Structures are given as C-alpha cells and as structure tokens.
A protein has these predicted regions:
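Acidic, low-complexity, intrinsically disordered interaction modules
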Residues: 14, 22-25, 29-33
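Short, mixed-charge low-complexity intrinsically disordered segments
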Residues: 31-56
Length: 56
C-alpha cells in the first residue's frame, strides 16, 4: 500500500509529497527530483489529498 511522505527541498523551500511503500524509497524518489530534499513527516490519504501539493 502506498503511503504519502511530506518533504521540503532546502534549496528551493518547496514542499512536496512522495508516494512510496516506505520512507527509504521515498527518499530515493525525492532525490531524483530535488537537490536537497528533507523528510518532514508521513501524511494520511486525506491530508495528502487536501494539501494540494504536488505528489511524485
């Protein structure tokens, strides 16, 4: 089951969500799209949908 992980990119300040099975996989995906991604927290399905943030 895919979980939603909130990240912030230190280089740009952009917040974004990564959908992955675990936080380790989410970190790998985040690093493919952003220079300095930092994991913030895990979001529920509702929180991820309501946030309006881009999800990778």
């Amino acid at each position: 089951m895919t979980k939603h992980y909130l990240f912030e990119d230190s280089a740009t300040g952009e917040e974004f969500i990564v959908g992955a099975d675990c936080v380790t996989d989410a970190n790998v995906i985040a690093s493919e799209y952003f220079e300095e991604p930092h994991f913030v927290c895990r979001l529920t399905d509702f929180e991820a949908e309501a946030s309006g943030l881009d999800e990778y």
